[in-house]
Amino acid sequence: MIIVLLGPPGAGKGTQGERLAARLDVPKIATGDVLRAAVKEGTPLGLEAKAAMDRGDLVPDAVIMGIMKEALAAPSAAKGAILDGVVRTTPQAAGLNDMLVALGRPLDAVLLFEVDEDELVRRLSGRTTCEACQRPFFGRQPGETCTEGGVSGTLVRRKDDEPEAIRKRMEVYREQTSPVIHWYEKSGANLVRVDAIGTLEEVEGRVLSALRIS
């Protein structure tokens, strides 16, 4: 199965994506992860991405889609993949669709995780992030130590996790994502809206039910 995840920051799509990927035995492919891997490996597309980042520019969609195509063509993705953070704009949605057609891989579903804005502010303003591994934590305080990923780092509260910054990010998210949702609706894609308020298990149950996975 090829599944695209959409949703605002703090909606839990990354966590649910990991759980879904484990259940389906497919990789969760996140744009940031594959970009960093391509840059580290020094692939031709990775070098193009690095050049753009070194200039302070956004990495071109064509480069991102090229890297995503390589990831989806890998043996590990033979059974499918969960795509997180891949689609943020309508050109990216169209580019991904064209790429999947070229690969002969159907898009099975687009999961849209929905959460009330006040709940997102509550969640994210209580989030800390490890300076070393960038893993987010909820319910832990700045200054605590993280030992995930084989490294030791300090937990910090990022400036963009302050309430005003969160509301600004939500405004940007709505402006970007509303056209994407409309594009998927017009394209006839299997767009599934998921109520993302509840425990991990409750939200996971809704995802599995929507996808008819037992």
UniProtKB/Swiss-Prot annotation:
Residue numbers binding AMP: T31, R36, D57, L58, V59, Q92, R158, R169
UniProt key word ATP-binding: yes
Any Gene Ontology biological process: AMP salvage
Subcellular localization, as worded in the UniProt entry: Cytoplasm
Main location: cytoplasm
Function: Catalyzes the reversible transfer of the terminal phosphate group between ATP and AMP. Plays an important role in cellular energy homeostasis and in adenine nucleotide metabolism.
Gene symbol of the encoding locus: adk
Binding site for ATP: G10, A11, G12, K13, G14, T15, R127, G198
Stretches the record annotates as NMP: 30-59
Catalytic activity: AMP + ATP = 2 ADP
Family statement drawn from the similarity comment of this UniProt entry: Belongs to the adenylate kinase family.
Quaternary organization: Monomer.
Enzyme class: transferase
Entry's Gene Ontology molecular function annotations: adenylate kinase activity; ATP binding
Species of origin: Gemmatimonas aurantiaca (strain DSM 14586 / JCM 11422 / NBRC 100505 / T-27)
Region (LID): 126-161
Protein name: Adenylate kinase
SS bonds (residue pairs): none
